[in-house]
Amino acid sequence: MFPQAVFDSDDTLTNRVEPLGNYRTIRLKPYEKPYGDIKTMKKHVNESTWITTDLHTTSGESRVSKVISTINDRVGDEGHLLILGDLGKASLSANMTRQYIESVVNSIKTKNKYLILGNHDVYSIDDYVQMGFKFVSDELLVPWGKIKIRFTHIPIPVNKDTVNIHGHIHGSNEYWYTTRRHHYDAYIKWDEDYVTHHGMTSQVQEGFPAIQQLGELFKYYDHERCD
């Protein structure tokens, strides 16, 4: 389905921003600008938006193909997909070619693809735009009723009226968390293992959430935390 992943010592990823080995710092630098219109994104990120993260396309073609198939079945040709980082997985000894990652991205049918950069997303913003993403940034903050949702790759502390939805967690439980500053009782573990990282088994079996499936969670914050 995808071209063979090529690891080449001459592939230096010269377009990387602030490389740390083969990793990047996630915060954008002054000379880097997010791509895409924030106002438009606030309209697109709604109850029918689908979310996934940490695809780590180096984890094996068979597993990646199954995940892409699941995405295409759920999102369809016209749906909206927000990816919370880590399309690939770089290492200190080898780089995955841009061609392979682009082929995986292009196999996702919908043209409405948006990317929040992860620590393994080592290419430039322009590269990800050329791959077909309509929005590329280090984070996205959208209003949601009485609260705000802050989408990031790495979990960050947020104010009491904000929910942080993120990827990146590589703990043994492998669950998404919503994080809130100074509200330790409000750390909520989602019922399904939507962030599956390298194995992806649960993601293939269980799928991944549309924001509409989080309604009870947001209702909880609306009424219990923001009044």
Language-model segments: which ranges?
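Alpha-helical hydrophobic/aromatic positions enriched in membrane-embedded helices and signal peptides
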Residues: 2, 46, 78, 145, ...
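Catalytic metal-binding/acid-base residues of hydrolase active sites
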Residues: 12, 56, 87-88, 120-122, ...
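Core catalytic region of metal-dependent phosphoesterases/phosphodiesterases
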Residues: 8, 15-23, 30-43, 48, ...
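Intrinsic-disorder/low-complexity peptide segments enriched for small residues
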Residues: 11, 18, 26, 212-215
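Low-complexity, compositionally biased segments
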Residues: 11-14, 18, 40, 75, ...
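Conserved beta-sheet core of the metallophosphoesterase superfamily
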Residues: 129-227
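Active-site-proximal beta-strand elements of phosphoester/diester hydrolases
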Residues: 4-11, 47-57, 148-155, 183-187
